A protein has these predicted regions:
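Bacterial N-terminal signal peptides
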Residues: 8-19
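N-terminal amphipathic, basic helical "cap/leader" segment at the start of enzyme domains
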Residues: 22-137
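Small-aliphatic-rich amphipathic alpha-helix that forms the alpha element of a beta-alpha
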Residues: 51, 70, 98, 139-143, ...
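A glycine-rich helix N-cap at a beta->alpha junction
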Residues: 201-218
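Short, small-residue-rich loop/turn micro-motifs
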Residues: 37, 143-147, 215
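Helix N-cap/coil-helix junction residues
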Residues: 182, 200-201
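Positively charged n-region of N-terminal signal peptides that target proteins for export
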Residues: 1-9
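Short coil/turn connectors at secondary-structure junctions
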Residues: 135-138, 204-206
Length: 218
């Protein structure tokens, strides 16, 4: 009897966790980010000198302004007349999407409108990597390649190009973080199968890397 009750309680607990982490929220609205501040920052050579990886994060929240600046630096539109971005992409496919996991939920960055589109409610940060620190970092970026935008390229070419393009974007994040005194680390240690299910990605959407961002722990 006790074992049966324990089993039932375990199932209920697991289902409740799943509901929190993967449920869609129809009532949530897009978050309009402030215009990115593009006329400040430190000299490039100093930023390159200070660029580094950090795996220790404060739980201090990142402001919407800093997040807007960060995402614009990563892969924002820097030439509005053509829609070209701050990082290059093969054939200008712009196949990389940036998903933003915070304590408030999972969002998709829309560079055209500088908004965060709600994807999932609930905090899924712990699912974005296998390291303990990912759940402490206030922002975890998930880089997802949409192969449907890459025309008739061969599968191996899509994988190569999207990996290279993600590298450009993640380095932009590194440089912005170095300029602003933020901590960051790009990560490949991800349970991609589980995270793909949580994010409800299509078969032609592939998780490439993730990147944690926050203030350094003091």
């Amino acid at each position: 009897m006790q074992s049966t009750s324990f089993f039932i309680l375990t199932i209920v607990w697991a289902l409740s966790i799943m509901c929190v982490t993967v449920s869609y929220s129809d009532e949530r609205k897009a978050v309009k980010l402030p215009n990115p501040q593009v006329d400040n920052g430190r000299p490039l050579m100093q930023v390159l000198r200070d660029r580094s990886s950090s795996r220790s994060f404060s739980t201090q929240k990142i402001s919407d302004q800093i997040l807007s600046n960060l995402l614009w630096a990563a892969f924002g539109i820097n030439r509005p007349d053509t829609g070209r971005r701050t990082a290059p992409s093969a054939v200008n496919w712009q196949e990389i999407d940036i998903y933003v996991a915070t304590a408030e939920g999972l969002f998709l960055y829309d560079a055209k409108t500088q908004t965060l589109e709600p994807v999932l409610s609930g905090d899924i940060r712990s699912a974005t990597g296998k390291q303990d620190f990912v759940k402490e970092a206030p922002v975890n970026l998930i880089y997802v390649a949409d192969f449907s935008r890459m025309g008739t390229a061969q599968k191996e070419d899509k994988e190569l190009y999207s990996a290279a393009d993600t590298g450009f974007i993640s380095q932009n994040v590194y440089l912005y973080c170095a300029s602003e005194g933020l901590a960051t680390v790009v990560r490949g240690s991800i349970d991609k199968q589980t995270l793909t299910k949580i994010m409800k990605l299509r078969p032609d959407q592939k998780i490439i890397l993730a990147q944690s961002v926050g203030y350094p722990k003091k």
